[in-house]
């Protein structure tokens, strides 16, 4: 159904950008469900940042894991200094190929046109550099925008993202044009905020 939407959007001259969440998943994600069921014996046990496995000899469930911003419903994928473990890396690369060139014929015209990457600053630069190489090899015109909450200069060197969501600018604009309370910026305060952003 989604690929039909992409096809119809393309017929109308529209581009489709999807939200890619590679830092964490939900508790209903198939690999995480397998980890819950099979604990250390799960073939996906190394995919997640598990802090403690359940001890079946006790009545309580000791299974704990790292959740994104401590949100238990959003288990984080385990990532070391060099990025995700290979099976996770491969999984993300495969889903990237799936949505960018759905039929795998080397022609990406039936796939999506871009990615908005959630919590991008929480994933290693090593991963993003490799991922961008894959993305641009499939379709050099793919638009890649990362969610970076603060200074994004490290991600904008031409080897990771094409753009970022500019939260500092957005916050300043909202405070100047929209806020009506004590957070509202005067014109000179707004100018100073923009100068800080420009560096």
Where are these regions (language model features)?
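Substrate-binding/active-site clefts of carbohydrate-active enzymes
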Residues: 1-108, 131, 137, 153-154, ...
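Active-site-proximal helices and loops of the catalytic beta/alpha 8
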Residues: 10, 24, 33-39, 57, ...
